[in-house]
From Swiss-Prot:
The chain crosses the membrane at residues 22-42, 97-117, 130-150, 170-190, 208-228, 255-275, 292-312, 336-356. The gene is nuoH. It is found in: Cell inner membrane. This is NADH-quinone oxidoreductase subunit H. NDH-1 shuttles electrons from NADH, via FMN and iron-sulfur (Fe-S) centers, to quinones in the respiratory chain. The immediate electron acceptor for the enzyme in this species is believed to be ubiquinone. Couples the redox reaction to proton translocation (for every two electrons transferred, four hydrogen ions are translocated across the cytoplasmic membrane), and thus conserves the redox energy in a proton gradient. This subunit may bind ubiquinone. It is a multi-pass membrane protein. It catalyses: a quinone + NADH + 5 H(+)(in) = a quinol + NAD(+) + 4 H(+)(out). Coiled coil: none annotated. The keyword Cell cycle does not apply.
Length: 360
């Protein structure tokens, strides 16, 4: 709000544009906020790939990137330049228009979702009351990019990978949505700020034990597993199983077009980390009592720490577990996670109307 008012005063009063200046100031402030979100987000993607290689290398008793720049810190930029300057090729019999629309359709929702993600009570582009519903809606659109890319490539490997990815995403989206419905039930809102505020209340209010991860622990586990499968990350990355279908719907893409898919995948990972922090880990709330001074004060710092912890968990999962078979993934989703999710909604409803309600 402070930035918006400053730009509106600048264009309306200082530059003498009147009512037009108020509108221009609003538009400019929104553009500036978008840039402030997107540039750090893209840099985070770059260095997330670096830390992924370092962490997995450490777990496998390797060094990881250590040549390009001090400690390999320039390696992400070398990878970016390599992809940007590679030739973008496509199969002769592919559908040219849809071939290039696919990566854009995958990337656009990953950027658009950040419009409603708050980093603290003030740092948010758009604070709407249906923020969670918006996230579920906008992220579900990315599957269209995968399907379009697989079909337009005119390759059996691409098409099979796209079918696997879309079926897996749709299946685990049900389980993840059921888990998030439980959070909405105990919070009484789909506004992210209200959900975080609700985690500071209840019987254990003001402590780490009041965050949703503990009272909703079974559904928290369902959510974490579903989130990994939803983003097609290991051990649920059968959509690009190298030993079976080469690289799935990525197989015919190179250069900048492949970079868009790569960027979308890692932005969705960071988005899931932010969503996990907001819904289950208290968002910007501190794990320490407020009487401890600065470290007990809610701030964006704690939001970023929790996001980093979830991202590390993603990397640990990839380095630890072998890839599941496709039939095992579908069985886990439909026969285990989805039934648990819907059963817990009923259990939670009974719990909340009982005398043992923890969220009063």
């Amino acid at each position: 709000m402070i930035m918006q008012e400053w730009f509106q005063n600048l264009f309306a009063a200082t530059l003498g544009l009147g009512d037009l200046g108020i509108t221009v100031g609003l538009v400019v402030s929104v553009i500036v906020k978008i840039v402030i979100i997107l540039i750090p987000l893209i840099l985070t993607v770059a260095y997330l790939t670096y830390f992924e290689r370092k962490v997995i290398g450490f777990m496998q008793l390797r060094v990881g990137p250590n040549v390009t720049g001090p400690w390999g810190l320039i390696q992400p930029f070398a990878d970016v330049f390599k992809l940007l300057f590679k030739e973008v090729t496509r199969p002769k019999l592919s559908n040219k228009a849809l071939f290039y629309i696919g990566p854009i359709m995958s990337l656009a929702p990953s950027f658009a979702a950040w419009a409603v993600i708050p980093f603290n009570e003030e740092w948010v582009l758009t604070n709407i009351n249906i923020g969670l519903l918006y996230i579920l809606m906008i992220t579900s659109l990315s599957v269209y990019g995968v399907i379009i890319a697989g079909w337009a490539s005119n390759s059996k490997y691409s098409f099979l990978g796209a079918m696997r990815a879309s079926a897996q995403s749709i299946s685990y989206e049900i389980a993840m949505s059921a888990a998030l419905v439980c959070v909405v039930m105990v919070s009484g809102s789909m506004n992210f700020s209200d959900i975080v505020a609700a985690q500071a209340k209840g019987i254990a209010g003001g402590s780490v034990f009041s965050w949703n991860w503990l009272p909703l622990f079974p559904i928290f586990i369902v959510y974490l597993i579903s989130a990994v499968a939803e983003t097609n990350r290991a051990p649920f990355d059968v959509a690009e199983g190298e030993s079976e279908i080469v690289a799935g719907h990525h197989v015919e893409y190179s250069g900048f077009a492949f970079a868009l898919f790569f960027l979308a995948e890692y932005i969705f990972m960071i988005l899931i980390a932010a969503l996990t922090s907001l819904m289950f880990l208290g968002g910007w709330l501190s794990p320490f009592p407020q009487s401890w001074g600065f470290i007990g004060t809610p701030s964006a710092f704690w939001m970023f720490v929790k996001m980093a912890a979830v991202l590390y968990w993603y990397l640990w999962i990839r380095a630890t577990f072998p890839r599941y078979r496709y039939d095992q993934i579908m069985r886990l989703g439909w026969k285990v996670l989805i039934p648990i999710g819907f059963a817990y909604i009923v259990i939670l409803g009974v719990w909340m109307i009982s005398p043992l309600n923890l969220w009063k």
